[in-house]
Regions:
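Catalytic pocket-lining loop regions of alpha/beta-barrel enzymes
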Residues: 144-251
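Active-site environment of divalent metal-dependent phosphoester hydrolases
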Residues: 44-46, 86-89, 113-114, 137-138, ...
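Short, acidic/polar
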Residues: 61-69, 113-122, 202-203
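Active-site gating/metal-coordination segments in enzymes
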Residues: 88-170, 217-219, 223-225
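Mid-to-C-terminal alpha-helical segments outside catalytic/metal-binding sites
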Residues: 2-4, 9-35, 60-78, 239, ...
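Conserved, mostly hydrophobic/aromatic
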Residues: 40, 71, 94, 130, ...
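Hydrophobic faces of well-ordered beta-strands that scaffold small-molecule active sites
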Residues: 37-41, 79-82, 105-108, 128-132, ...
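Alpha-helical scaffold segments that flank or form the walls of functional sites
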Residues: 54-82, 87-100
Length: 296
């Protein structure tokens, strides 16, 4: 695993240098036109109170100022704060960061009965969707419940999306119901493919089918969690590219890598993206897709 300071092997595309608040770092961008967009990062401080059902108590944090420096050092132009399950519906830190920094957008966790006016205010602050963090739930919420039907109606009406994080084996019915509701859906972490079958199994087939709707996007994020090699991650990415094209994929670092079994750095995440999508032009189109989706 490459660490900061190690030599970076040459890759296809133009080699430019992005000057940040630290040393200038070589970054390959297609034509030096499209900076990286990190579509999945968690920003928080250790002072924030965790939710009662938090699945872990992280020994790291990632304040917004530190992350902005990290972005500059790695040629990342913009980023999307993904609502963190550990904080529940405490979205204060995310909203403050969005208000202060136009290069950031974010998602929030809300109760299904949240008022429309609250959502509209969040939208003006830079929020672009809600997150269903439904991993590790003993029982999934009922999307046909009137409260959830109203929530999905409001999300669609605002032009927002539902960010979905769920185990692969539980994905098909939830994703199908969301697509039928008319909302846009962004599926986290490659869609949690089966480690043996990849996208050939039931859950993978459901994801590929949903991509055909034109209302579903997938994040190439958190591959370090899967316990598979770069070649396998590259096959996952290639399958998704073949199914939907780069316009329906986003890249995300998942910093600060809470729950990682081995140390992971931000540079590791950036370099992993280059390895699993070795074509610099495709990486540029993936970043442009995130620019369009979250910032236009």
């Amino acid at each position: 695993m490459t660490r900061p300071g190690d030599d970076v092997p040459p890759r296809s595309g133009d080699d430019v240098r992005v000057i940040g608040s630290g040393d200038d770092v070589p970054v390959n961008l297609p034509g030096a036109e499209v900076p990286l967009v990190d579509a999945h990062v968690h920003l928080f401080t250790s002072a924030l109170p965790l939710a009662a059902r938090a699945w872990t108590r992280p020994d790291v944090d990632l304040p917004v100022g530190k992350f902005l420096t990290t972005m500059d050092e790695h040629g990342v132009g913009r980023a999307v704060i993904s609502a963190m399950s550990l904080l529940g519906d405490l979205n204060d830190y995310t909203i403050d960061a969005l208000r202060e920094h136009d290069r950031l957008r974010g998602t929030v966790i809300v109760e299904p009965g949240v008022d429309r006016y609250v959502l509209e205010r969040m939208r003006s602050d830079g929020v672009r969707g809600i997150r269903f963090q439904w991993r590790r739930l003993a029982e999934l919420p009922d999307l046909d419940d009137p409260a959830y039907r109203r929530l999905l109606f409001r999300v669609a009406d605002l032009g927002w999306h539902v960010e979905l994080n769920i185990e692969g084996e539980r994905l098909p019915p939830v994703l199908d119901r969301l697509v039928r509701s008319g909302v846009q859906v962004v599926v986290d972490h490659f869609g949690d493919p089966d480690r043996r079958a990849g996208y050939a199994g039931k859950s993978g087939a459901a994801l590929l089918r949903a991509l055909g709707s034109g209302r579903v996007w997938v994040k190439l994020s958190a591959g370090y969690r899967f316990g598979v090699g770069t070649d396998t991650l590259a096959r996952y990415a290639a399958t998704l590219l073949a199914a939907a094209g780069p316009e329906h994929l986003f890249w995300g670092s998942d910093a600060p890598f809470v729950g990682a079994r081995q140390p992971v750095t931000y540079r590791d995440a950036v370099e992993s993206f280059a390895r699993i999508v070795p074509d610099a032009a495709l990486r540029g189109r993936i970043s442009q897709a995130a620019n369009t989706f979250y910032f236009d």
